[in-house]
Amino acid sequence: MGKYQPSFQTKKGWTEVICGPMFSGKTEKLLHKIKRWKIAKISVVIFKPIIDTRQTNIVKSRNGEYDQAITINSPFEIYDHLVDKNYQIVAIDEAQFFSNEIIEVVTTLNEIGTNVIISGLDTDFRAEPFGCIPQLLAIADVVNKLDAICNVCGSLAQRTQRLVNKNTNDNLVLIGDAEAYEARCKLHHSFLTKKHVTVKTKNFKEQVQGKTQ
């Protein structure tokens, strides 16, 4: 899907999603694209959720790049900022923190010809689908799935390791950075509460593991 290049000449807008674990460069890639569009005189507006308190009214990558953003609580607030202005692209950072209302908003924007680019975590610290992102991936025209580097072994990492409050009953959302999270590969991702599996799956794994011992 990465070879597909969205066109600005279509009557319907397109949606692109940039996803991956923490420390995979999602915001960096988002800002890089926005910078290129602005050089080409393409109008872009950026939104971010109010729950992300790490930066105020800006979207900032870990390499220091940043751009101005509008902080909103509800996805429907995006409409208020577009009524009197004709932006060609709406950019949304940290989209996993928005409710499923974001699906309706993105679909509506595409219907009226507005293009949307989104960045967000596709899985949470439990390695399970995160919030609205799976549905956004389903309706996206382009998906950029990024990898990070595992803090333990240096291999490609697809998961986010929470270093504190990492039990099932702990809050799903914990705003933080390197002090609270690391990127991990599947082998080194640790989650304290084991996921429930069926008896058939348990028996199958025991049989396979028994052959390798």
UniProtKB/Swiss-Prot annotation:
Binding-site positions, Zn(2+): C150, C153, C185, H188
NCBIfam families, sorted: PRK04296.1-1
PANTHER family: THYMIDINE KINASE, THYMIDINE KINASE, CYTOSOLIC
PROSITE patterns reported for this sequence: TK_CELLULAR_TYPE
Subunit-structure text: Homotetramer.
Record's keyword annotation contains Kinase: yes
Top EC class of this enzyme: transferase
Name of the protein described by the UniProt record: Thymidine kinase
Gene for this chain: tdk
Biological processes per GO annotation: DNA biosynthetic process; thymidine metabolic process
InterPro entries referenced in this protein's UniProt entry, alphabetically: P-loop_NTPase, Thymidine_kinase, Thymidine_kinase_CS
TM helices/strands, residue ranges: none
GO molecular function terms noted in the UniProt entry: ATP binding; thymidine kinase activity; zinc ion binding
A GO cellular component entry from the record: cytosol
